[in-house]
C-alpha cells in the first residue's frame, strides 16, 4: 500500500512539473491593415514621327514628368466608339506644359487622399487630321453631336489643351464611374448626377469616384464640361483658346 502511494505521489509531482514547464500562449495584437501605395515605372521609348512633331511644337510627354500617371490612349487602339485605330504612331500623352503642370498637381493631390490610386489618361493632344477622320465617320449619324466639327472650329484636344482621364487602382483597373469612357448618354453627364443617382442610373460608389476625380482635377485649376465626366480643359475662355497653337497636321 505504501509502495502504491509512493508511486501515485511521484506521478503527481511529475505531472505538475510538466504543466509548469509548458510554454505560455502569448496573444499578439492584430496587425493594422496596410494602405496600398501604388507606384508605376514607365518605360521610355523613342518618339515616333508624330510624337516628334508634337514635341517640336513645345508639347510635353506627361509620362516623362511623372511615370506614376498611367497612359492608355484609346484611339491608338481599335477599341473605341468608332471601332477603328486612329492614332497609328501616337501612344504618348502629349499636352501643353501648362496643362501638364496642372495634371501633375492633380496626381499629387490624389496620392495624398488615396495613395492606392493613380490618374489614367485616355486622350490628350489630337492632330487636326485625326479630328477630320473622326468627323467624317460620324457625319450623318446619331453620334454627330458628340464629335467636334473641324470645319466650324476646333476642340481643346486639337490644341493640346484638354485631357480625358479617369482613376485607376494598383491592379491597372479603372474605377467604376457610372458609364464607360466615350459613352454618349445622360449617364456620362456631370450636371445631373444627383438625379442619376436617385433614378438608379449610377451608384453611390460611382458618384463618389467621379467626385474624387473632379476634386483633384478642378482643384488643380482645370475645367469640366457637362456632357463628359472624363474631360477636363485647360481653360474655358474663348479668348485664351484663340492664343493657342493648333496641332494642324
Where are these regions (language model features)?
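Short, low-complexity intrinsically disordered segments
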Residues: 6, 227-228
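A short acidic (Asp/Glu
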Residues: 131-135
Amino acid at each position: 500500500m505504501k509502495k502504491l502511494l509512493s508511486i501515485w505521489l511521484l506521478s503527481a509531482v511529475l505531472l505538475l512539473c510538466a504543466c509548469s514547464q509548458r510554454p505560455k500562449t502569448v496573444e499578439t495584437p492584430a496587425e493594422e491593415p496596410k494602405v496600398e501605395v501604388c507606384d508605376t515605372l514607365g518605360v521610355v521609348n523613342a518618339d515616333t514621327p508624330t510624337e516628334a512633331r508634337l514635341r517640336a511644337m513645345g508639347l510635353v510627354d506627361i509620362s516623362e514628368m511623372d511615370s506614376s500617371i498611367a497612359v492608355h490612349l484609346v484611339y491608338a487602339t481599335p477599341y473605341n466608339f468608332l471601332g477603328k485605330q486612329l492614332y497609328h504612331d501616337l501612344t504618348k500623352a502629349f499636352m501643353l506644359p501648362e496643362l501638364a503642370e496642372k495634371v501633375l498637381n492633380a496626381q499629387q493631390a490624389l496620392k495624398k487622399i488615396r495613395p492606392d490610386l493613380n490618374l489614367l489618361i485616355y486622350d490628350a493632344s489630337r492632330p487636326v487630321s485625326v479630328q477630320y477622320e473622326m468627323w467624317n465617320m460620324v457625319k450623318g449619324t446619331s453620334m454627330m453631336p458628340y464629335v467636334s466639327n473641324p470645319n466650324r472650329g476646333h476642340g481643346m484636344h486639337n490644341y493640346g489643351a484638354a485631357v480625358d482621364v479617369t482613376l485607376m487602382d494598383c491592379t491597372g483597373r479603372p474605377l467604376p464611374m457610372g458609364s464607360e469612357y466615350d459613352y454618349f448618354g445622360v449617364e456620362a453627364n456631370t450636371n445631373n448626377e444627383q438625379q442619376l443617382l436617385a433614378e438608379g442610373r449610377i451608384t453611390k460608389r460611382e458618384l463618389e469616384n467621379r467626385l474624387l476625380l473632379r476634386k483633384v482635377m478642378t482643384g488643380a485649376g482645370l475645367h469640366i464640361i457637362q456632357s463628359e465626366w472624363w474631360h477636363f480643359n485647360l481653360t474655358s475662355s474663348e479668348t485664351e483658346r484663340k492664343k493657342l497653337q493648333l496641332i494642324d497636321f
